Amino acid sequence: MRNSIKTIKYLVLLANIYAVASHAEIQLSGNITQGGMVVGTTTPDNVVMLNERKLKVSKEGSFVFGFPWNDSTEYTLTIIDANGNKEQSSFKPIPRQYKQSNIKGIAKKIMNPNPANVARSAQDRKQTVAARKVDSDYNYFAQGFEAPRQSKVTGVYGSQRLFNSVLKSTHYGVDYRGQVGAKVQAPASGIVTLWVPDMFYSGGTLIIDHGHGINSTFLHLSKSYVKVGDVVHKKDIIAEVGKSGRATGPHLDWRVNWFDVRLDPQLVLDLPPIKQ
């Protein structure tokens, strides 16, 4: 096990863990960078800790973790085998530079919502927060992701968004061009945990659970072909592009979370499926 962890430490220092450890104890794939996701496999009865947080390990030995967009935390990954032997490796996410974009034409009622809409958006948030807390045993996240649309990317993760020249938010998704009614496919298999057709800010909002806290959110949809509880498979047609909610035109906003940690979907797409 010691040689395996030494290999992991070497890979971590390179910041990108695309190669996997040559030993069978643990394999990792991912990006040690802000917004990155790391998927690993290990012996199923090993305990995996990220700092003080115990990570779920599936019966196949899969586990996953990720980093916020502005993360500067020092992390320690700890592997404890069935005999109590412990190995550790420390690392820190590599910082990134993000773009800034100015979005014009945002309606006054969106920029300065009235009390009723503030209350409505708070209720919307409760629903999305609850859906993103789901900690299922599925390991669909380890099977690789594909883009939900094969169209031009018009907005990227981490960009600082100015609405009518006023700095308002950070964009946590990736935007794809598409006309109203254009098809959206599931980027990975999972279970539908939320569908609301008319949230105040995000409009038609769909969330799919991929397991272990990894979930996809699709915003501004005009239609969903699936409902809560449905099982979907990678590349299934699940919805249609729209311009609902706070959108100045039709497009798909796709987001990926690890619980409440917002990940970069384009980095997630870089991860190959993990052999199990």
What does each of the following model-derived ranges do?
Residues S4-N16:
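Sec-dependent signal peptide recognition
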Residues A24-Q97:
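Cationic-aromatic interfacial patches
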Residues R177, K183-P187, F218-L219, G229-V232, ...:
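Small beta-strand-rich domains/subdomains or short beta-sheet motifs embedded
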Residues K183-L194, Y225-V241:
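Short, well-structured beta-strand-loop connectors
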Residues S90-S202:
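Surface-exposed, glycine-biased beta-strand/turn segments
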